Structure formats: structure tokens, C-alpha cells
Amino acid sequence: MEYNFREIEKKWHDYWIAEKVYKVEKDTNKPKYYVLDMFPYPSGAGLHVGHPLGYIASDIYSRFKRLQGFNVLHPMGYDAYGLPAEQYAIQTGQHPEITTKNNIARYREQLEKIGFCYDWSREIRTCDPEYYKWTQWAFIRMFNSYYCNDEKQARPISELIQAFETSGTEGLNVACGEELSFTAEEWKAKSDKEKQEILLNYRIAYRGETMVNWCAALGTVLANDEVVNGVSERGGYPVEQKIMRQWCLRVSAYAQRLLDGLDTIDWTDSLKETQKNWIGRSEGAEVRFKVKDSDKEFTIFTTRADTMFGVTFMVLAPESELVQQLTTADQKAEVDAYLDRTKKRTERERIADRQVTGVFSGSYAINPFTGEAVPIWISDYVLAGYGTGAIMAVPAHDSRDYAFAKHFGLEIRPLVEGCDVSKESFDAKEGIVCNSPRTGVTPYCDLSLNGLTIKEAIAATKKYVKDHDLGRVKINYRLRDAIFSRQRYWGEPFPVYYDADSMPQMLPEECLPLLLPEVDKFLPTETGEPPLGHAVKWAWDTVNQKVTEVSKIDNQTIFPLELCTMPGFAGSSAYYLRYMDPHNDKALVAKDVDEYWRNVDLYIGGTEHATGHLIYSRFWNKFLFDLGIVCEEEPFKKLINQGMIQGRSNFVYRINGTNKFVSLNLKDQYEVTPIHVDVNIVSNDLLDIEAFKNWRPEYNDAEFVLEDGKYICGWAVEKMSKSMFNVVNPDMIVEKYGADTLRLYEMFLGPLEQSKPWDTNGIDGVHRFLKKLWGLFFGNTDTLQVTDAEPTADELKSLHKLIKKVTFDIEHFSYNTSISAFMICVNELTSLKCSKRAILEPLITLLAPFAPHIAEELWHQLGHDTTICDARWPKHNEEYLKEKSVVYAISFNGKARYNLELPADISKEDAEKAALNHENSAKWMEGKTVKKVIVVPGKIVNIVVG
């Protein structure tokens, strides 16, 4: 019976669906295990072979854990909101809901073909109202919460209001945008609008002025990762920095908990380090600088308080409010021109780019430690969102300050004994402090740091700042609050309306979900409002508690709804929780369900989400933990980043000025231009010439210079991309070789966490392996050849070696070496002509996570009437692995002369006798005396003769 993969795979797809093999329920009699893939954005292009890499890896592990007796939750869904669908809608007029639905259907079809063990009854789509109801619900809860630094958790905003009523801001230690001070009497005297404005300063979800990446052509704010080289990633439109009033989430309040939590989870060191750097904890001091000839002052934050005596200039971020306040009249034109230029650069570009730019403000600041007036400059290497948006520049001991000082000819004053700053700054934090104050200069303050180590000087300066009311000791974080609104259509609507004072009010939770309205255009309105401004019915009737026509707005009982929508990360920040209880219409997740599944045991996805989704999900989960909604503070116990499957591009070589193409090894004889060719018409680098001629009209009459009658293409490893014609559709592989071959081959390409090129040159070998496996069961006949005979020692050794190896490899995600071990074992069993049930049944159980279709078929051929998914993972027996004999190297005076096979359990004495009495030893001992024999058990017998 031949291995007919098409027939087998369809048969078992149908069976798994009909029997609901992968449907999972809470089962307190079994230990749980939750395996999750980062769910895909369903683009119109569908899946290419790079996408399933992580999905296959997680599927193998899910099946493995089920075979070990775990109750495994392994769901799949779609991150369905996003800019690409909206842009397509703008270009074609087709509603993004339709294109998204079609794309999801395509993805689902492709995923099902590969044979994943997803529980499709739990499928979620972030654009479904039943799903985004809970995104809106979480937002309302954040709006109605503040963060208490003392208790280190979110608390109801009503408690903060009560504190204001009782004692104002006295004694409060809470996360806020701006530190305010008022008494209870002052609070009570404020209007409702003033109170609401103040509360926005403390709410976890709030509206605030923030610097954003604004793309006028797209009519929306873009996240940093949506901007490349100053233009939008989507469409390549110009992007500028702009201050806008936006909805934000106070992620910064959770900065320390986000840091501390990294010590409790099993993530790679590199990923943890990325998050630590992104959160950016800095211990330092805030110091106030007065502006010369003015009553103004401003604050800087520094981690190097020891360098106060080396400040030779100050720098403001271009976005700082101080820029307008401190720019003098004669410098205004130059400053304004500079600000216009910097608007075109994102923060990421400013951080990465070392080009020095800046402009003098015309004002000076007084150094509180030296009394010197130092110039205040403006430069885009300072960011408004970190620290205070102003820095003190110490060019001798900071590389960016040094480059700036060199460029503009500013003083560089070294503060460490023996340091040379003639060519570069001295950034090391070790050494003895000098010039603090400088010799021969009348001290301005009574602090001297000279002779102290840098560490001692930092501590002394911090104490001086605190004792003399020059500022305060402070911990800063680089982590910013998340901008949470987008001027787009295709996203979650905010459950927000604006009252007569234009203050935001939340919809009642029982009125959720607030549905995304229909619009006739997906572009901003003529007056610049977001696309929801086109909606006819987009006002909130507070009496009837429903959406009504915009024309009815009276700002008494009917009010305008928010026109922005939520960003892409809104729907992906808690989706792992919804999978636990996807059909619950009363709660995000029921308490008993959450306490059973708890959190994700294994999460697999790409490293590109390190500073976006993975930060926001952790924040979101911690907030829900504070509210008592979830029982675990961290959402993802273990995280693995799969590598990327790169494209293997092929090239043909056109002789310049002709339509003639020359084969790879002959191209150096001509002047040629390499041209990308569709990899799907190339096999093992051999071009299908007829297919090439039919590929594009311009090649219909192409001519070829061949070698040995063949056209050999060139190749290169590049990003998999449609423009390079190197995208490989998994459907084609499944059709030609089967899903099991695709699954095995993707894992066989190399270590899971490394990037590797897609190369079909080895896929035939994997397919042959499955045929060889099939042959163990059927031989060359149409009937099953498996017997119940007792297995031999060699057969048992081969099997148990495999059990041990594959178990270890799966637990360590070393799938490529597992597949090598399978191939070795099947070769050994084929050589042994093994057809024993006691060997072959455990073999296919081991293979089931990797190649579930063929394993299921062979399992049923062996007479089982239940799915192999419910079999039990075999355990190896060390007794079968013990070697019966071992090869000794027999040496004379330290030189190996021959090998001798001896029993593995032989004693040292018997090994010595065997070596001395062996016929091969006679010639090396002839005429000599044996002086000593050294036996290293299991390895060497060394005979010393003389």
C-alpha cells in the first residue's frame, strides 16, 4: 500500500473536526497547560511558508503535553483591526470588514490544511463586537482608576476624590502627569470642569497633550514602528512631530513592576534586556537651574550628579515648552527654522542618528554650583519625554555632549584626574574627581568633591542638593505613557462621549459594546476630523442610553461621541485571557476559569514585539490583577522567539541589450544584468524554461545560453517578499508533498530560534523519510505487516534511544535534532527488518506531534479506535540503552596500536589479561618486559614495555 498523503490528510482533517478531537474544556482532574501563538494580522496575501514556523513549533509542544496527560489549551484567532485594511478600503471603496472577513477565511483554510490542533470553537477576532466589548470595558475601568505608589496598585478614582475632599493633595503619593498642590478647601471651590481636568492628571486612562508622529496624508497618528526614515511604512508618506491632545494609558506608573516582573518569568536574557532598556530605570537627581536676568527656572534630571562642576552649556528638547519662553527676539527666526526641520524626524531616528544639529536660544542659565552663566541651546538629541526635556551638558564625560561641544566650539572641562578628553569624552564611571571646584577659582558653594571617587562624589552631591533645597533625589524611567488614540476608522470605538463642558464621560458598562458605525468615506472629514466624523448616527442619548443621530446633539441630553478609535495594540493586550472563556457575555473571563488556566505557560512569537505588544500586555494584565479580575500578575510564563524563515531568491542573467539569458556558470563571459525570477518555476536551481517564457509577456520570445542542456539559476538569501518573487505559498508544498512533510521540513531547517533560509532542495529527503516509515508497516504489500513478536535487543535499543532523545529535544525545543533522530531510528529499524508492534506503536506515538496525519492513520491501522492524541507518551528504559560491549584502544608506551572489543562490564584485571594475551599484542611485546599496565575502564589499556 502506497503512502497516499492527500487521501490520509483529508480523512483525518474530517475526523478531527467531526469528533471534536481538539475541543478543550476545563478539567480539574488534569493538570493544565496553555500554549499560545502570537495571533496573526490577516493580510490579503495570506500565509507564506515563514508564517507557520512558530505555529508548527507550538503545535508540536501542545500535542506533546497532551500525550503526557495535560489538559492543553491551544487556541487561535486574528488581530483583525489595523491600518492595512483601512488603506485598502480607501483605495478600493470596499469596507474593511468585508476584506478582513475574506482574509480571515483564507488564513483559516491555510491553517487547517497544515493540521494544527487548535480548538476552533475558541476562535476570536478583535473586530467582533462580542470581543471588543471587553476592550472597551477595560478602558472604562482604567479611566475610573488611579495608581497609588504607596500600595503599588491601581485603586478606584473615587478613593482619590475622597482624599481630595478630606485633605487635598497632602500626603498623597500617586502616579500623575504633573505634580499638583492644593488643599481640601481649594478642591471644593473648583468647578466641576476644573475637577475633571485635575482628575485627568491622575487617571490611568486619560486625555493629555503629547508629542505624536502625525501623517497628514493618512490623516492619523502613527506608532514609532509604523515610521521608517521619516515616512510612513504604509505608503511612504511624510511624517512630522506634532503636539496633539490624545487618549493615553499611564503605563509609566507600572514601570518598576514591569521591571521586577522580569525576574519571575522564563524569557531569554536578550529579550529581558531589551525590555529593561526600554523601561530605562535611572537613579539620579533633579536640579533646578535659574535663568539669567529672569525669574524663570527649569529642572534637569541627571544620573551623574558628580559632574555639576563641569556643566558648560544646557540643552532643551525642541518640543519643550521652555523653548518659546527662553528664546530671545534676535534668535527667534533661527530657532523657528530649526524647529520646523526637527518636526520631520521621529524620536527613534533622533536617537539613532549621531549627526550634530542645534541652535542657540539666546538665553543663559546659572549653574547653582559654580555661579557661572552657561548658554542654553536647543537640539534634537534631547527628547521631551525622558526626564524633564532639558539637560545639563557635561561634554568631558558624555559622548553626545562632547560631539555637540566640538561642533559648536563650546568649552570642555574635565573632572577626573588624568583623563584625556582631547579626542573623545571620558565616559567611565571610575576615577578620582578634580576641578570640582577648580583650583584658583573662588568657590560659589561650600561643596568640594575633589579627591573623592566618582561614586562618593555622586552620593555627596545628591545629599547637598537635598539639604540645600536645590532639587531632589529621584528615580526616572524612560518608559512613556502609551498613546492610545488613532485618527482612523478601522479600530475599536471609544466608549466615550463629551459633555457640555467638552469633558469626557464614560458610557455605562451595561451599554457595551459601542458598535463601530457605518461611514461612507474612510478618509478624514473636510474639516480635518477623523473618519468617524462622517457617521450620521454617532451621538449618545443619555436618557435612552443609545446611539442616535449627530443632528440631534443638544449638549443637554444628547452629546457627541469620541471620533478617534483605539490603536492596534488595544485588541491584542488581553486576548490570551479571552481565549480562556470566549463565549462569556457577563465577564472578560469567569473567576473559576481564570483560576484554572491562570496564565500562558508557553508563548511563541517574533522578537519584533519586545517593546510594543509584550510591554502593553504585561501592563494590561497587571492592571487587571490589581482589580482582582485575574489571579496571575504576569501573563506569559515562558516566551520563545522563533527565528525568521528568509527567502531563497533565484536569478536569471540577461545579456545586456538583448532578450537572451545565460546560465549561471557562463555569465562571466558576458555583460549581464541579474533579474529576480519566481522561485516557483525553479527546482533545485534549475529553471523551467517553458514556465519562464509564460511567466511574463516580455519573456515569451526569450533565448537561452545553456550548460549541459540546462539553465542554472543564481541564488541569494533575502527577506521573503513579493517584490523579489521568493514567496513560497505553503499550499503548494502541502499539495505536492503533504502537510506532514511541510511540518517536518520547517522544523528540520535548523534551530527554532535562529533565522534560516527557505530552501526546498532538501524537502524530498524528508518526504522519503515518511515513505520509509510507511514501509515499516506495509513493506511492499497492501496489507499491514506488523506482528506481535517479541522485539530484539537491538530493536529495543534503537527505540529507547529515540524516546530519550526526542523527549529531551522537545522539552528543549530542539526540533531539528529530533527529526534527525527519527531518521536514524527508521533507518536502523529498516535495516533490522523490524515489524514488531512493541516497537512501531511507540514510534508513531513519538512522531504524532510532528506528523499527526500519518501517525493517526498508522495508529488506526494498528487497530485503535480512539485518536492517537489520547495515547500516552512512552518513557525510555535505561536498561535497553546499556552497551553490551565497549571498544578499548590498546596502547604500547602510550601509542595506540589496535582496538579490542570487550564486554562493557569487564573488570580491570580481566581487561588487562585480554590485552596481554591477544595475538596482536605479541609483536609489540616481543623481546621486551612488561613493566606496568594501566587500564582506564571503558577506554584504554596502556602496556608499558622496556
Swiss-Prot record:
CDD domains: Anticodon_Ia_Leu_BEm. Belongs to the class-I aminoacyl-tRNA synthetase family. GO terms for biological process: leucyl-tRNA aminoacylation. A motif ('KMSKS' region) lies at residues 719-723. ATP binds at K722. This is Leucine--tRNA ligase. It catalyses: tRNA(Leu) + L-leucine + ATP = L-leucyl-tRNA(Leu) + AMP + diphosphate. It is an enzyme of class 6 (ligase). Gene3D superfamilies: HUPs (3.40.50.620), Isoleucyl-tRNA Synthetase, Domain 1 (1.10.730.10). Keywords: Aminoacyl-tRNA synthetase, ATP-binding, Cytoplasm, Ligase, Nucleotide-binding, Protein biosynthesis. Its EC number is 6.1.1.4. One of its GO terms (cellular component) is cytosol. GO terms for molecular function: aminoacyl-tRNA deacylase activity; ATP binding; leucine-tRNA ligase activity. It holds the Pfam family Anticodon_1.
